[in-house]
Every structure is written in C-alpha cells, then in structure tokens.
Amino acid sequence: MKLAYWMYAGPAHIGTLRIASSFKKVHAIMHAPLGDDYFNVMRSMLERDRDFTPVTASVVDRHVLARGSQEKVVENITRKDREESPDLVILTPTCTSSILQEDLQNFVSRASIETEADVLLADVNHYRVNELQAGDRTLEQIVTFYMEKAKSNNQVLTQKTKTPSVNIIGAVSLGFHNQHDIAELKRLFQDLDIQINQIIPENASVQDLKKLPSAWFNFIPYRETGLMTARYLEKEFNMPYVDITPMGIVQTAACIRSIQQLVNALGAAVDYEKYIDEQTRFISQSAWFSRSIDCQNLTGKKAIVFGDATHAAAITRILHQEMGIHVAWCGTYCKYDEEWFKDQVQEFCDEVIVSDDHGLIGDLIAKTEPAAIFGTQMERHIGKRLNIPCGVISSPVHIQNFPLSYRPFLGYEGTNQIADLVYNSFTLGMEDHLLEIFGGHDTTEALSIGISAVDSINWSEEAQKELNKIPGFVRGKVKRNTEKFARDCSKNLITLEVMYEAKEKVSS
C-alpha cells in the first residue's frame, strides 16, 4: 500500500459505485467509515444529472466496531428496499472496511430473505484492483447474475433481430465526455442502419439485461469498461464484439470496416465505403484541416501524451498519423493493460511510459520540455506550473470536462473536437509575446528541472530585466535552462554573469 495525495485511478469501491449509479433502479450500500463516503459529493458535483446519487453509506463507527456490522448493514439494505423499491441492491465494502474481514456474503444472504429486490455483494478484491478494473468486474457480475437468473427461468431472448443490431457496453457515470460520445455513437449507428438494442449500464434497467443476446454484436468503445462483459457474452451466447475505438479519422474508418466485415459474416450485405469517404471528405472538418497551412505549422512540434489506455493510445495515433506532430513519449496509468498499450503505440512515439506515479510523470514532462501536453487534470496542473499548454484528453478530470455543450471525442464529430483541442493547445507564433506587449497577460512562474524540485532560486533585478527582454514564446525555456545551470553549479542567485555562462554552456 502506498500513501499518495493524488491517484489517477481511484480505489476499487469507486468503480463499483460508478456502475451501480449508472443503472436505473439500482441502489448501492457502501460499508465504509466516514471519509470513504465522498462518492455522493463527487458525483453530485461533476455529473450533469438531476437525480440524487443512489448510494447510501453504512457507516463503520465505534458502535459497529464494538458490536459487529451485521445488524446495521442488514437494516440499511432492508430500509432502502422499502424506501426506494430498487430492482437491485449492491453491497460494497471499501479497502478500509475490508480490514475488518467480515463475512459480508452472509449479510447479503440474510438481507435478501427480507427484501423484494435482488441483493448482491460486489465481487472485487479491494487490495488488488483499482477503480477501472473494479468497474469492469462489477458490470460483468451484474450482467452474469441476471443472465443466469433469466436462463434458469427460461426468459433469455436469444432470437436475433431481423436487421443488424448492436449493444453498446461501457456508458458509465463520471466517464470522460461519456454522454456526448454515446450520443455520437447513436448517430453513427443510425447512419449505418444498425439498430441499437441496449446501451449499458447508463440509464439501463437490470430487468432488460436478458435482451442483450438479441443483438447481432456488442460494441465496446472504451477498453476500461465493458471488455469482461463482452467476453462473457461471447463465451455464453456466441456474440461477437468490436472493440476498436472510433477516435480520429483513421480509427473511425477502421472501426466501421470492422463492423461491416462482422455484419456481412452474419448474413447482411452492407458496404460502408461510400459512407466513410463522404464523411471523411465532406462532414469531418479535420481531414482537410490536417492538410491546411494552419495545421502544417504544427508539423514536427514536440508533444507528450498521458492518460487512460483508450484515450492515450488514440490521441497518440491522431497526433502522429493525422497531424504530423512528434510524440516524444506517451504513457498510461493503466498498468494492468501495459501489453496492449505498448502494442498500440510503440510505432507512433519515441518512448512508452507505464506508471501511476504523478511525480515521475511531472519530472519527465519537465525534462522533455514539450511544446504541448495532452493528459489528465494532473498534467494540466503540471503544465500550468511549467508554463506549458495542456489539452485534457482523459480522466481523471474536473468540472470543466463535464461540459454542457456537445463535445464528443468519438465518431466524425469527435474528430473536429480533437482537431480544435490539439490546435488550440499549442502556443501560436508570438502569441505570448504580443499579449505581454499589449497587456492583459499574466506571466506564470515556471519550475526549472523537475516538478518535484522544492528549493528556490532567486533572480537579481538586472537578470530579471534581461529575461523580460526575451520574447515570451522562448522565455520559459531560457529560464528553465538558466535555473538548471545555476542549480548544477550550486548558485542560489542568478545574475547577468550566470545568465551568460548558462547561455554559453547550452550553446556549446
């Protein structure tokens, strides 16, 4: 266990609660001490939703520690069953309450005798998996439970629809631009004349899960959530799935061709090549934009990419293949998916980083000195400290990346959004310099060699004046190089002489 003040992926119970709060008429009971029960506040703040978060904390306090948890947990489950009339109640401990080593399955068995709702214990090892893995496992557990229940009652709908149809698996509460992506996928499948059978878990009913096998195939837009469910459905009901993320012109075309091949193999006769060509040339603005003089100004610019496996891999491909931007390194915090990630991106960047240590990532960014960063909320903070622009392309994110306006990352409309994000993330020409000349621009203090450096270096008045004469678009780099030289030489005050010495050293 590691003490950290920042985690890219949260603890396991957050993943379980995200899945539970995505379904309709599902209530989660969190067996946790005060301090672990922040999910309600976080979801209420971030998710653009009118409804209350369907999560109740069964607080572990001194009374519980003295008498045991069973009575309180069972009472909370039965009370919520009476008050909310849910279809399903999920009980999840947290990594803290797991220390008590209680037989929670026994609590669930006891409570289910008294409830109308089904009651499940989240089957997750809270010490071995993170938020993303736990969410994936919880979704599979719920689908498996209701499919097995329907099978035993002979209620599974295995009769395929007459026309091609799809289940979209992985629309989850608190996902990165998730609602917009799903809206774009609906539009895409409508254009392809593929009817949508089910979208799970967002706004889905557990009572409708028995209809999943009616679809021709399953579609998994994000690797982080849904793959385990798709593999279960493939194994049990022989349902194929497509897991190519349609992000960027190239990958969207690859995804559509994969769908075409699959539905034709299942008995349809479709040809989507004309649709791909029309969308690429006339609907998506990013194809011609990538050949414009504006985008050519970005050719060879250095960038770094960091995020979850799905988004980091897709953005790296887009920067390299579609925009000609040099990706110095790309990375992910999804250490469990390292093999797939490396296979996807190693051709498109100089180096692949797999780490969940934000300090290491910050130091690497400072050392690389890219022209732009594409990362999470943490990389945005790092970029502000280093005076390097950052485009946010992946969770974890803050409120500004739960926009009210339509901003998908998937599909052809998503290509326009990504092109805007990439182009606007780079500092254009002498923008900083002009802004400083005409006022209204706050200069951000930049750190020197690494984000984790804590000691400070002072500048003399003459040296600061000399630094201010340097054009803004290179000033940050000059400052960092000078401070690095001063630090290496154990100098705490930068004078004009130190500046010139640093310049000579860098030039040589």
Swiss-Prot record:
Taxonomic source organism: Pyropia yezoensis
Protein name (database record): Light-independent protochlorophyllide reductase subunit B
Keywords: 4Fe-4S, ATP-binding, Chlorophyll biosynthesis, Chloroplast, Iron, Iron-sulfur, Metal-binding, Nucleotide-binding, Oxidoreductase, Photosynthesis, Plastid
Major subcellular site: plastid
CDD domains: Pchlide_reductase_B (cd01981)
Entry GO terms, CC: chloroplast
Subunit structure: Protochlorophyllide reductase is composed of three subunits; ChlL, ChlN and ChlB. Forms a heterotetramer of two ChlB and two ChlN subunits.
Molecular-function GO terms, alphabetical: 4 iron, 4 sulfur cluster binding; ATP binding; metal ion binding; oxidoreductase activity, acting on iron-sulfur proteins as donors; oxidoreductase activity, acting on the CH-CH group of donors, iron-sulfur protein as acceptor
UniProt EC number: 1.3.7.7
